[in-house]
Design a protein with these regions (language model features):
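Acidic, serine/threonine- and proline-rich intrinsically disordered appendage/tail regions
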Residues: 144-160
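Terminal connector regions
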Residues: 99-149
Length: 160
């Protein structure tokens, strides 16, 4: 009887222990749109769950900075996905951000070069009792012509 109690207590201790965080492979962030209102990105990640139990993803938070110093903002996107135990799960999340300042685009368009960006984010897992935030970072460039099209109004008869 004592051994049975010890086995039950050990099982409860393991079941209540905090899960190990998954590893996040930052695959890519693809700019899907740039216009006068804001910017859209598809964020692709690969999350590997090292635990013996499934983990639930609640949301993804992304913070975008352009050209090293232009803070576009932060957005949180609900994303309910299950990370299967002991497996890698691909995640693809669409993120839309409005320009925090209307003057953000003009200096970028006038710079005469592609615009580097960095997305710093967190993948939030768990529920109300236990929660884990796993950070990730993605970077890339936005082609100058995409910035120009967004920054300048169309002029009839002029092609860019």
């Amino acid at each position: 009887v004592r051994i049975r109690h010890l086995v039950v207590l050990a099982s409860l201790a393991v079941a209540c222990s905090k899960p190990m965080p998954p590893t996040i492979g930052a695959e890519r962030a693809t700019v899907t749109s740039v216009d006068a209102a804001g910017i859209g990105l598809d964020v692709d990640l690969a999350a590997t769950n090292p635990n013996a139990e499934d983990l639930s993803v609640r949301e993804l938070t992304a913070h975008l900075v352009l050209s090293g110093d232009r803070d576009v903002g932060t957005v949180t996107v609900p994303n309910t996905v299950t990370l299967a135990a002991g497996k890698t799960t691909p995640l693809s999340v669409h993120v839309s951000l409005k320009w925090s300042e209307m003057g953000t685009l003009a200096p970028l368009a006038l710079a005469g070069a592609d615009v580097p960006y960095v997305v710093d984010g967190t993948l939030s897992l768990g529920g109300m009792l236990q929660s884990i935030g796993v950070p990730f970072r993605l970077s890339g460039t936005i082609p100058r012509d995409q910035i120009l099209r967004a920054a300048l109004p169309p002029i009839p008869g002029l092609t860019r």
